[in-house]
Amino acid sequence: EEGWVPGPSLISLQMRVTPKLMRLAWDGFPLHYSEKHGWGYLVPGRQDNLPAASAEPEGPVCPHRAIERLYRQHCLQRGQEQPPEEAGVEDELMVLEGSSMWQKVEELSQLELDMERPGRAEQSQMQDEDGLPELVEESSQPSFHHGNGPYNDVNIPGCWFFKLPHKDGNENNVGSPFAKDFLPRMEDGTLRAAVGRTHGTRALEINKMVSFWRNAHKRVSSQVVVWLKKGELPRAVTRHPAYSEEEDYGAILPQVVTAGTITRRAVEPTWLTASNARADRVGSELKAMVQVPPGYSLVGADVDSQELWIAAVLGEAHFAGMHGCTAFGWMTLQGKKSDGTDLHSKTAATVGISREHAKVFNYGRIYGAGQPFAERLLMQFNHRLTQQQAREKAQQMYAVTKGIRRFHLSEEGEWLVKELELAVDKAEDGTVSAQDVQKIQREAMRKSRRKKKWDVVAHRMWAGGTESEMFNKLESIALSASPQTPVLGCHISRALEPAVAKGEFLTSRVNWVVQSSAVDYLHLMLVSMKWLFEEYDINGRFCISIHDEVRYLVQEQDRYRAALALQITNLLTRCMFAYKLGLQDLPQSVAFFSAVDIDRCLRKEVTMNCATPSNPTGMEKKYGIPRGEALDIYQIIEITKGSLEKK
């Protein structure tokens, strides 16, 4: 081309040559692209595909010796600064909340369903074996490295080819090592520019830094904004000492779909999904840019462990009708993060993973995800785990928490046991194990001419786990003729009623019970707050709810009364839940919010300064917004003297 000069030109992260130019390596192994398998990496040491010494090479020779040296160098460096096994996980990865998690849970639970259906286990095992990329001999795979491979149809002399791990499973190809799912691996040093390549490392850092804004800027710039003239502003704003006529005052109208999911949760792509401010993410202070006009405050709170408590109280009402009567409920009520006795800390200790990871597993499990989900997630969080190790950890976790399946025999099953004189081990509650059910089926098929399978099971249940009672209750609601939420009696979509869906979508229906009850919780809170604001003349209005979090725009002089109203609302809402489930009292540990936030901008914690690359001086220096207040019930009572009356 005319005007061409040596050096990089129009190179973007989307180009296949970029990882090579940066000399990107995965655990010390250089990245390589295969048309068939997508991005992977080369592991040196393969002998069976080396050309004979006498043969003339047709094209360029793979420098497998240099790759070996690179890996040795990486091992030496790793020996000096060994990364922790549980790598820090990026916010985006933890967002398995809401719809994205839900899709994943549904897909993975389908796997579990397939495994539970008769005859499917063997079939799926055969399919798995058929679906393997290539059954490789012991000699043609490295002894010092395991991963997703080797794929020996990629014939690189002296090297095995392994695929990069994909978040949706190893059968999927990775299209770009710069995708946001690889940010945690960049942070923990698994994916980095090879030793001594400072430019590559810096490019990765910049990519990580702009990742949030690259994904969010179009949504942010397309927000609907209404600017207000001075005459349209309340007097409380225009008469406030901080009011400036040179400033523009307006409001964003978030385009919320009010019941956008099957569980009636709101859907909105920007504000309901925005992550918290991070020091290494451009634009991540986005939420804090929503600031109140002079003379107003944002009063709000997060409902503590909302869905965990709802699930726990359902199980307790089902088990003994007393708060804290199940292990799961006791941990929810009495567990403390500082003592390591809360649910997430216990799960983390049981399986040997970090608390943050345990949180994702716990919510996934309560949403109805099965063991395949846990296995895949374990391998996603720690790519150095083998399939077998992940399976063992997942089995251990599910046996301790969810328990094991037990079965109540149908009349046909009881008759077969009697007629065939089979010895089955019945528990106190009359249930039998899966092995006994299989034995009855096997003997019945062997001794009868009937080709159709015998229907020996009346219904299934969970037993022996800390959460068994809770899952039994959730499944009993989900499988009832017309599932409805226990508190406000909201019915499930007719498309998911058992008469239509039969045994399908059980995961969705179990999740619906908990998440739709959480929406009942929100609706009760909104109604209670509206009533208290009107009854006690509190000058404020509802601003936004972000799933288990509510925010109210309140005039400054009423902010503490609004905070007390919020605490009373939480008390009334929890009481309503307990009463509807037949419980006549409420533990104090869940009666009130641990803290009500009074602030001048939207942020996760009132103490966060939200310093980011695009807001380096933070909220206080640049915008004059000091730290807010986070008040517990005792502090609020002290300030308001326990009264909502206007003084």
Curated annotation (Swiss-Prot):
Keyword vocabulary terms for this entry: DNA replication, DNA-binding, DNA-directed DNA polymerase, Magnesium, Mitochondrion, Mitochondrion nucleoid, Nucleotidyltransferase, Transferase
Q: Which SMART domains match?
A: POLAc
In residue numbers, the region (Disordered) covers 116-147
Q: Where is the composition biased (Acidic residues)?
A: 127-137
Q: What is its EC number?
A: 2.7.7.7
List the Gene3D superfamilies. 3.30.70.370, 5' to 3' exonuclease, C-terminal subdomain
Q: What is the official name of this protein in its record?
A: DNA polymerase subunit gamma-1
Organism the protein comes from: Gallus gallus (Chicken)
